[in-house]
């Protein structure tokens, strides 16, 4: 759980948004976090996600807890990861 902090870029591993990248916006409790794509960027809507269904990456952006989608897009532009977020990750197996 400690790897999933606000601003961490993750990959969804289950559900209809499987293999899409998302960003942790808020920590709800020990089992759930609030994530967003943003939707217009990766297709991931702002929603609650189980931490067991996320794979944390080494990348993170500097955002405040509960940041808006516009703030997140701005932070991604600043570090040059905007285009990288659009690409889905293929399963390694």
Model-derived regions, located:
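Ferredoxin-like alpha/beta domains used as RNA- or RNAP-binding modules
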Residues: 1-6, 13, 23-93
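Short, charged beta-turn/beta-strand-edge "cap" motif at the junction between a beta-strand
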Residues: 15-18
């Amino acid at each position: 759980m400690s790897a999933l902090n606000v601003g961490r870029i993750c990959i969804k591993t289950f559900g209809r948004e499987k293999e899409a990248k998302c960003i942790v916006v808020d920590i709800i409790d020990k089992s759930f976090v609030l994530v967003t794509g943003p939707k217009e960027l990766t297709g991931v809507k702002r929603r609650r996600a189980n931490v067991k269904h996320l794979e944390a990456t080494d990348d993170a952006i500097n955002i405040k807890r509960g940041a808006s989608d516009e703030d997140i897009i701005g932070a991604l532009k600043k570090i040059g990861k905007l285009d990288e977020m659009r690409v889905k990750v293929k399963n390694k197996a």
